[in-house]
């Protein structure tokens, strides 16, 4: 039987965080009572492999917004990039050099 892959957690408590290469295929937890922003950096800064998935969870009460770094395109339903509420989540999936899908609980 294939052993399931366990996901690693990156707990963030600040109001801003920019993804790093070590976040690939991990869960990033944003835990702040104030509004906070997670930025997806351009490939020139952080060269994630195409197909990389990163789950973002809004643990705190402050709304987590997913932002595009310089030259990055984020594709989401209705262009929504704010996580829908506390304990809501979204997944960022890299589909091209500087293009990502953002799917999940977005408002």
Kindly give the residue locations of the regions a language model identified.
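Terminal beta-strand-rich extracellular "head" domains
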Residues: 70-85
């Amino acid at each position: 039987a294939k052993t399931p892959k366990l996901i690693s957690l990156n707990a963030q408590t600040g109001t801003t965080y920019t993804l790093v290469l070590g976040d690939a295929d991990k869960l990033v937890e944003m835990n702040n009572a104030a509004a906070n922003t997670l930025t997806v950096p351009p490939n020139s800064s952080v060269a994630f492999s195409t197909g990389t998935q990163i789950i973002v969870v809004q643990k705190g009460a402050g709304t987590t917004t997913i932002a595009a770094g310089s030259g990055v395109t984020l594709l989401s339903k209705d262009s929504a990039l704010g996580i829908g509420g506390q304990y809501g989540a979204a997944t960022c999936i890299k589909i091209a050099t500087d293009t990502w899908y953002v799917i999940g609980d977005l408002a």
